[in-house]
Amino acid sequence: MKSILNDFLLMIQFFTRIPVNKNLQCEKENFKRGAFFLPVVAFIIGGMEFLIYLGLKNFLPANVIIVLLILFTAMITGGLHMDGLADTCDGFFSLRDKERIIEIMKDSRIGSYGTIALIIDLLLKYQLLYSLVLKGYSIAIVLAPIIGRISILFLCLSKRTAKKNGSGNIFIGNMSKPIIFFITTIVLVLSTYFLGLRATIIPFIGVLLITYLLYLLCLNKINGLTGDTLGACNELGEITFLLILLMM
């Protein structure tokens, strides 16, 4: 029980800015087991967003609430995944060789492509969430972050790391397939309860497809994955899920 709590708190500490005032074991096995809780962390984030939405929907227009929710997400996650998307776009669109691309991705400064990617990411999230709320799919506020993290887990099934050292290496190739498939089944069952089978399966297939295409792009550009590409995967997974759901 103590190790389970350790791994859960480790995921909260690693993926959010929620203060965890506790010394935790941070071995590879802790992260491997802790992957089970990544969608749970996403559920906590999405759940808080949903509660904010419910608390404000009678006082503010939906479009204003969505802006506040996006701001809240950026604050509670430290913009971790958005930063990964920006770094990935800066590197991949630089049209340089592998070594130079990785150097660009490690640079803390944001470039033109990263800026454009963030603007598009935020605009799409805003418009998609706003449109889905108006359509009666406010539950997407909770589901999108969970599906995004699920896509990260699937990407981590690959053992191809682009760097010898990096924060992403503790996840890449270290995920348990049974755990990932078990978590995915639970998430899909819950999503089906709220959205129906068709509105769950088709968007999820789209997310898996985008995840695989990103994987192929990563192999082509840098011969593997990094922590930044995992963050990019989350953002692309969320947007793909929301976009296809809106089309249903």
UniProtKB/Swiss-Prot annotation:
It is found in: Cell membrane. One of its GO terms (cellular component) is plasma membrane. Its EC number is 2.7.8.26. Pfam families: CobS. It catalyses: alpha-ribazole + adenosylcob(III)inamide-GDP = adenosylcob(III)alamin + GMP + H(+); alpha-ribazole 5'-phosphate + adenosylcob(III)inamide-GDP = adenosylcob(III)alamin 5'-phosphate + GMP + H(+). Its cofactor is Mg(2+). Its main location: membrane. InterPro entries: CobS. The chain crosses the membrane at residues 36-56, 59-79, 114-134, 137-157, 170-190, 199-219. GO terms for biological process: cobalamin biosynthetic process. Pathway: Cofactor biosynthesis; adenosylcobalamin biosynthesis; adenosylcobalamin from cob(II)yrinate a,c-diamide: step 7/7. Keywords: Cell membrane, Cobalamin biosynthesis, Magnesium, Membrane, Transferase, Transmembrane, Transmembrane helix. One of its GO terms (molecular function) is adenosylcobinamide-GDP ribazoletransferase activity. It is a multi-pass membrane protein. It is an enzyme of class 2 (transferase). Belongs to the CobS family. Joins adenosylcobinamide-GDP and alpha-ribazole to generate adenosylcobalamin (Ado-cobalamin). Also synthesizes adenosylcobalamin 5'-phosphate from adenosylcobinamide-GDP and alpha-ribazole 5'-phosphate. This is Adenosylcobinamide-GDP ribazoletransferase. It comes from Clostridium botulinum (strain Langeland / NCTC 10281 / Type F).
